Amino acid sequence: MFSEESNPSSHKGQFDPLALGELLASRSPNQRELLEVRIYRGLPSSSRDPRGYAAARAQIAHWQTDSRVTVVTRPLRYPKPEWSADLKPTEKGIDVQLAVDFATMAVREQYDTGILFSRDTDLLPALEFVYSKSVVARCETASWRNGNKPHGRLTIGKFQPFCHWVDAADFALIEDATNYVRS
């Protein structure tokens, strides 16, 4: 995101999700205690991409050394062999899983403030649901800001939930420079 390199290494741009959660909680205008950070990500195939799979598992294990971190994975979808070799695997179902959890956990009163760090408009129905239906849960968003240029944020019609802007200086505080790929 904030790399100066034209072709950065695969581990450049990584951040520590717990450090991000702590940063957002510490900057809130309300006193908050960070109870959980949830990460949703695709998981490489152990047979099609053993190095990527091992790196992902190492990263997840590192994140989960703190009991406040929950990682939700779904298998990456790989292109069929007859398709272009340039096609990369894609995440499928991650946004749906995140949306279901965001809404379900609000209804069950499992959080009082949920911060959705995404610009994926597929998540708007979940944000709208929590905003309009939840009695207890408050929804907020987070998004990257590069210099004076915000990268966009999720909004609900004319309502703009509070947005936590994260910039390059913040990224320097939460960056994870670990290379999880084994040589």
Locations of the language-model features?
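Domain-level signal for Mg2+-assisted phosphodiester chemistry and nucleotide/NA-binding surfaces
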Residues: 1-89, 145
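Nuclease catalytic cores that cleave nucleic-acid phosphodiester bonds
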Residues: 70-183
